[in-house]
Amino acid sequence: MPIPAPHGGKLQDLVIRDSSIRSDLFKEIADKKYKTLTLSPRQLCDLELILNGGFSPLTGFLNEEDYNSVVHDMRLSSVKNEKNGKGLLWSMPITLDVGQEFAGKLSKGEKIVLKDLRDEKPLALLTVETVYKPNKQTEAEKVFRGDPEHPAIKYLFETAQEFYVGGSIQGLDYPTHYDYIPFRKTPTELREEFSKLGWDQQKVVAFQTRNPMHRAHRELTVRAANDLGSDGHILIHPVVGLTKPGDIDHHTRVRVYQQILKKYPDGLATLSLLPLAMRMGGDREAMWHSLIRMNYGVDHFIVGRDHAGPGSNSKGVDFYGPYDAQELLAKYKDELEPKIKVVPFRMVTYLPDEDRYAPIDTIDTSKVNTANISGTELRQRLRDGTEIPGWFSYPEVVKVLRESNPPRSKQGFAIVIDSSDSKQGEYLSFALQSTLNQFSGERRITKLSSEQATPFIVNELVKSGSGVIVPTKSNQSDIIKAVGSGNSIIVNFNGEQNADQGIFSLKEDLTSVIGEIVEYLVSQGFYQQS
């Protein structure tokens, strides 16, 4: 089947390329001294997809009327569906949040220069249509179901500012990327690639992921393509913008995707990266992802169990049901098809007795041996340096993961000393450095002064595999937050002690405390027992 038309019928491409118009715009910016707004990481991701058409039919950040319509009805008020006369489907509010002081200086029709936070490069001009204060509680409840622990709701109340600015965009340039350029394709570029590959009259199923891929993912995507017939193909389309806090970094993941791409039959799959800021919005996010893939020229989209869900809250309650996303998309099937069809994710499992994968819904697990490795177990195996079996993942993928997730024996750590007694703290630092340097291995032991020990510097040293000794008076908690509690040891003077959690007190003599710290480092795998 031919490449589907974009959502709304027109693929937006808002970057102005005419040299004379661009010259006039930059002169206008210089002459009129427009207000400037430096974008946050999420706003930057959103702007890129507005500019390149990934968010078609949007031509800017939502004005108040469109925002309210999306929040309450999952539809745009300004763009109509030609078939039913209703607002066009759009499930996620794309908003530009600003502070009260900045908002108070804006007026309708005014232009704002939007800048990249990394290099201050002007990316776009926004013409103000509306400046409004959203009801964040309503947004939280309608869009994300209201649980205050939901990461998008935490962002809404803890990070997003009080006012939203809606308006249309004139694009000056895309944000600059320096990594994986061949894989960063815009919707226009990806559609052109499909034509070059001869896929423009065939079927393409997109696979969305924010995690590394293993053998099971390769198996399920190949099955999805085969189910489409002899003309089925696969787009591996991972998110490399903002994902869930704690996810594996995109550099590691892209290296994994490059390796696993080689494991597909020739001509079956291609890889492109999506600079999306995920909201982890479950069913609404699945709808959003489907519309985005339509704009990228895909006609089938795999929607998995708990698609784009953030898991469960601190009480163990899931934010979304396992099939909420599939059910919502089925409800709007008539408006999505024939442009894009949802392919329900068929979970596969390994059958060790037969050395093959099979869809779990086709076997009787009470009669057949199955094997699987959970994400938690995989992380533990990486941390311990234990074997990851070949039936689970490819050696090339495991190698990439081990490079980015070394075992504890090669990881760095920080010993954070509460140096309220500066002389004793300095002496303990010296004693620890001397003690730890006597052990064999590649790990360097670095002692920083309180002035040198910013959270960023300590974390960078720990990430490089160093042991860092940090006497500090004020920013102890910030350093531990940056490094992570699993790689931190705390030493305080006359305070609490919990050796099992890496917290030590100098109530005892210095030699005993150093011995306990060394014992703890050995027990956690940072050093091998001699």
Curated annotation (Swiss-Prot):
Catalytic residues in the record: T209, R210, N211
Enzyme class: transferase
N-terminal: annotated segments: 1-178
Gene Ontology molecular functions: ATP binding; sulfate adenylyltransferase (ATP) activity
UniProt binding sites for ATP: Q208, T209, R210, N211, G304, R305, D306, H307, V348
Pfam families: ATP-sulfurylase, PUA_2
Coiled-coil ranges per UniProt: none
Catalytic activity annotation: sulfate + ATP + H(+) = adenosine 5'-phosphosulfate + diphosphate
Stretches for region Catalytic: 179-410
Superkingdom field: Eukaryota
Enzyme Commission no: 2.7.7.4
UniProt keyword Cytoplasm, yes or no: yes
Region named Required for oligomerization: 411-530
Pathway field: Sulfur metabolism; hydrogen sulfide biosynthesis; sulfite from sulfate: step 1/3
UniProt-annotated site: Induces change in substrate recognition on ATP binding, residues: F345
Residues at which sulfate binds: Q208, R210, A308
Major localisation: cytoplasm
Protein's GO biological process: cysteine biosynthetic process; hydrogen sulfide biosynthetic process; methionine biosynthetic process; sulfate assimilation via adenylyl sulfate reduction; sulfate assimilation, phosphoadenylyl sulfate reduction by phosphoadenylyl-sulfate reductase (thioredoxin)
Site (Transition state stabilizer): H214, H217
UniProt GO cellular component terms: cytoplasm
Classification via CDD domains: ATPS (cd00517)
NCBIfam families with a match to the protein in the record: sopT (TIGR00339)
Oligomer and partners: Homohexamer. Dimer of trimers.
Family to which the UniProt record says this protein belongs: Belongs to the sulfate adenylyltransferase family.
PANTHER family according to UniProt: SULFATE ADENYLYLTRANSFERASE
Protein name: Sulfate adenylyltransferase
Gene encoding the protein: MET3
